[in-house]
UniProtKB/Swiss-Prot annotation:
Domain notes per entry: The HXXXXD motif is essential for acyltransferase activity and may constitute the binding site for the phosphate moiety of the glycerol-3-phosphate.
Cross-referenced PANTHER family: DIHYDROXYACETONE PHOSPHATE ACYLTRANSFERASE, GLYCEROL-3-PHOSPHATE ACYLTRANSFERASE
Compartments where found: Cell inner membrane
Database matches in CDD domains: LPLAT_DHAPAT-like
InterPro entries listed in its UniProt record: GPAT/DHAPAT, GPAT/DHAPAT_C, GPAT/DHAPAT_LPLAT, GPAT_PlsB, Plipid/glycerol_acylTrfase
Name this protein carries in UniProt: Glycerol-3-phosphate acyltransferase
Organism of this sequence: Ectopseudomonas mendocina (strain ymp)
One biological process term in Gene Ontology: CDP-diacylglycerol biosynthetic process
């Protein structure tokens, strides 16, 4: 092909004719990011002989300014007539094809390298995808038109070009340096076989990452579930338990399978891509994506499970859209059965959603079918997505992980770990979430509403608002095998039993959930709305003049740059003034002018809503805010005291907010933050003692505002402890303490004018009490009553004096005493 001037002329004419219809693009700009050494020969390798594929590659190389594959290339003193070859050689005149044969071009290049006729040669694997979809056995439309795992014939390729040619994607992969392989001195033949094997594996993994594994039809998949031994056993037990025939029990299992299974359809994926492209451009100012390249690298050869945070219903669509646009297979998505609504449910199912009930309790047959469905997805290499938080976060915080799906994943992996599983955390950060008005009601205490198809019209009515930007950050992957090696060494050799439920499963699953939550928080995207919310909600009147607010924001940005939370955390562009203008443009800030300048404030509605956006990043500011709190009641504190009180309080902050640092790392991290405080003028250091600025200074005001970021959290801690101490030993249960804390917090919020409903969120008190139990500070007797360690008094009085103002401590103690006098604990 293209070996003579006449054939090159014909090829050029064919390419021009092809591009009268075809439109192509490189996946993630891969042609523009190749790191090629132009002084050394470059060869492109395609998997199968295809003139149309070659024409597309030639066009993309021309667009990117890369060496063209159809032009001659010098290899030492020898001139190769073209700079490409096929991994599977072209057929001979009789149509015969040696699929294991070695390309003559590759043979000659390796020979030249072995003879040192040339220093090196670069091999660039290139994949061309006509459309992007997994294959299905019985869908004639897709078998004819979409890229799949089947060998493509000329007629089928022609139809593919006509139907899918306007959605052609090209992936240029990292160059392979042949010199590195030749220098292994394995001889000509073995080196050629090694190169051939490397390329063959590469193309297989690349294809799986982009179009997905080879899949079977949904009906066949569901039928296959009921033939699994574990499901057959569950069917037999169901028949015996319910006194029905095996046929009826099997029919019920099939109904469960059809209720659960997705119906992944390429036409719907393409339809959603077109609709969502319009939607994102209509409603958002842009989508920022970070570290998707790392996902592309790890997707090859792994079973990928995406574990995003859950802030909005459009999380499902956004992640699938971005993966598809970046040349990765959209995942099969776990969705609550409440979303299986008329019209919407069918669309989501064809877009990759599979549906699950909120609880599996009391239905072992459903449990067996669901577990087997997930095991099938995992073992066949389908990417999967589920939300470890369970539901959407209404408060903006990372919710405590629901470990059900993680446990199913762990058990599936223990059953068969042929394909390594990797969890990919995905942080999705909104400057304004679509469901903001709904969340506003729920933040004010309204009950959670059931999803309805009519919610769509509410979203459409909100399109006139400005929603800013969305950031999607891919965090540090968690390889399940490595995690198990750390948590349970020797797990591969253990006898796990037929149900794959080792005794350590629950504890290990809980630790895995915490690891995922921390990795999600590490990938946080800090945006202007987060920072403005953090600053203004820390003021007593929810207001600052514009210059003061800009100074606060500049301080926060400087601190975050001095002590980065994690390599995966991203910061907004611009200074404090630019951030303010951005948030004003979204109508989240009110403004009042007077003779002295501008006052920026939050009205009542936005004040509640902005707690949601503050909470998105509270975990990042919790530790520096805690350190700043120590200086609200003390002018001078030694490093040793700072560390002692930090270590006393940090475990509870870490448990609530999923902060990344372990207790062993605190010394170094605290030193970094203290150094940053000194650099910004918030503290002075005298030997081993840190000194706060004068109370009348601007720096002390900034230090105070920072400390208030975590004030309500610390007040909740003190409330629970004060109530417990006043109740006495073995006098109150955890549930009773939760209720009392909630009532007390509601009363204090009225007394002190706190407009933050999460202040009396019962679940936060529940988790704090559990943390006290985990730390050994509390114990439960056989009746469930709580007793406390003597250290609790020290924690309450010693640390609380350092971080809470005297009037707040007095008010909390007074309310606790009033409760004891009015409602004595039951004996």
């Amino acid at each position: 092909m293209t070996r003579s001037p006449l054939r090159r002329l014909a090829f050029g004419a064919l390419r021009r004719l092809l591009y009268l219809w075809v439109r192509s693009e490189t996946i993630n700009q891969s042609a523009f990011t190749l790191k090629l050494d132009r002084s050394k020969p470059v060869f492109y390798v395609l998997q199968q002989p295809s003139v149309s594929d070659l024409a597309v590659v030639d066009r993309e190389c021309t667009k990117a300014g890369l060496p063209r594959p159809v032009l001659p290339v010098a290899v030492g003193e020898h001139i190769e007539p073209a700079a490409f070859f096929y991994l599977t050689p072209e057929p001979d005149w009789f149509g015969r094809q040696d699929k294991r044969g070695i390309s003559p071009t590759l043979d000659r290049v390796v020979t030249a390298l072995g003879q040192h006729a040339v220093d090196d040669a670069q091999i660039v694997p290139v994949s061309v995808f006509w459309g992007q979809s997994p294959d299905r056995e019985t869908s004639a439309w897709k078998l004819l038109f979409a890229d799949s795992w089947a060998v493509t014939g000329r007629l089928r390729r022609l139809v593919s070009i006509l139907i899918l040619g306007r959605k052609t994607r090209v992936q240029f992969s990292t160059p392979i340096h042949l010199r590195e392989l030749v220098e292994q001195d394995k001889g000509q033949e073995r080196t050629l076989r090694m190169v051939h094997r490397i390329l063959r594996v590469h193309f297989r993994n690349q294809k799986a990452a982009v179009i997905g594994p080879d899949v079977s039809h949904r009906r066949n998949l569901v039928k296959g579930l009921v033939h699994d031994p574990l499901v057959r056993q569950a069917i037999a037990e169901e028949a015996e338990r319910e006194k029905i025939s095996l046929e009826k029990a099997e029919a019920q299992a099939l109904r469960y399978g059809n209720e659960i299974a997705s119906d992944y359809t390429y036409t719907v994926i393409r339809f959603l891509e077109l609709v969502l492209s319009w939607f994102w451009n209509k409603i958002y100012d842009g989508i920022k994506v970070h570290n998707v390249e790392g996902v592309r690298d790890i997707a090859q050869g792994h079973e990928v499970i995406y574990v995003p945070c859950h802030r909005s219903h459009i999380d499902y669509l956004l992640l699938s859209y971005l993966l598809f646009r970046n040349g990765l297979t959209p995942p099969h998505i776990a969705a609550g059965i409440n979303l299986n609504m008329p019209v919407i449910g069918g669309l989501l199912r064809r877009g990759g959603a599979f549906f699950m009930r909120r609880t599996f309790k009391g239905n072992p047959l459903y449990t067996a079918v669901f577990n087997e469905y997930l095991h099938t997805l995992f073992s066949k290499g389908f990417p999967v997505e589920y939300f470890v938080e369970g539901g959407r976060s209404r408060t903006g915080r990372m919710l405590r992980p629901k470990t059900g799906m993680l446990a199913i994943t762990l058990r599936s992996f223990l059953r068969s770990h042929r394909l390594p599983i990797v969890f990919v955390p995905v942080y999705i950060g909104y400057e304004r979430v679509l469901e903001g008005r709904t969340y506003l009601g729920e933040l004010r205490g309204a009950s959670k509403k059931k999803e309805s198809i009519f919610d769509l019209f509410k979203v459409l009515g909100a399109l006139k608002q400005r929603f800013g930007q969305v950031s999607v950050n891919f965090g540090e992957p968690i390889k399940l095998a490595e995690f198990l090696d750390q948590q349970q060494p020797g797990w591969r050799q253990q006898e796990l039993g037929p149900q794959y439920r080792p005794a350590w499963l629950n504890d290990t699953t809980n630790r895995l959930g915490e690891r995922v939550a921390r990795h999600l928080n590490e990938a946080a995207s800090i945006n202007p709305v987060n920072l403005v919310a953090l600053a203004l909600l820390s003021t007593s009147k929810l207001a600052l003049d514009d210059r003061a607010l800009a100074r606060v924001l500049d301080l926060y940005l400087a601190l975050l740059r001095a002590v980065p939370y994690s390599p995966h955390t991203t910061l907004p562009d611009g200074d404090g003034a630019a951030l303010i203008e951005h948030v004003k443009g979204m109508d989240l800030l009110a403004e009042q002018k007077d003779a002295l300048g501008k006052i920026l404030y939050l009205d009542e509605q936005n004040a509640v809503l902005m707690t949601y956006y503050r909470n998105n990043v509270l975990h990042i500011f919790a530790l520096p805010a805690l350190l700043a709190s120590f200086f609200q009641s003390s002018a001078r504190i030694s490093r040793e005291q700072i560390l002692r009180f930090t270590k006393a309080l940090y475990p509870y902050l870490q448990a609530e907010l999923f902060i990344r640092w372990e207790i062993e790392q605190l010394d170094d991290v605290v030193d970094q933050w203290l150094a940053a405080f000194v650099e910004q003028g918030l503290l002075k250091v005298e030997g081993d003692v840190y000194v706060r600025p004068a109370p009348s200074s601007r720096q002390f005001v900034l230090l105070t505002l920072l400390s208030r970021s975590v004030a309500q959290t610390l007040q909740r801690f003190y409330m629970a402890i004060a109530l417990l101490l006043n109740a006495g030993q073995n006098a109150i249960s955890a549930e009773e303490l939760e209720d009392l804390c909630t009532v007390m917090a509601q009363r204090l919020s009225i007394l002190h004018g706190l407009n933050a409903p999460e202040f009396f969120d019962k679940s936060l008190f529940r988790h704090f009490i559990q943390s006290l139990l985990d730390q050994g500070v509390l114990r439960q007797d056989e009746a469930g009553k709580l007793s406390h360690h003597p250290l609790l008094s020290e924690l309450a009085e010693g640390a609380a004096k350092r971080v809470l103002p005297a009037e707040i401590r007095l008010s909390i103690r007074q309310v606790a005493l009033d409760r004891n006098e009015d409602e004595p604990a039951a004996p």
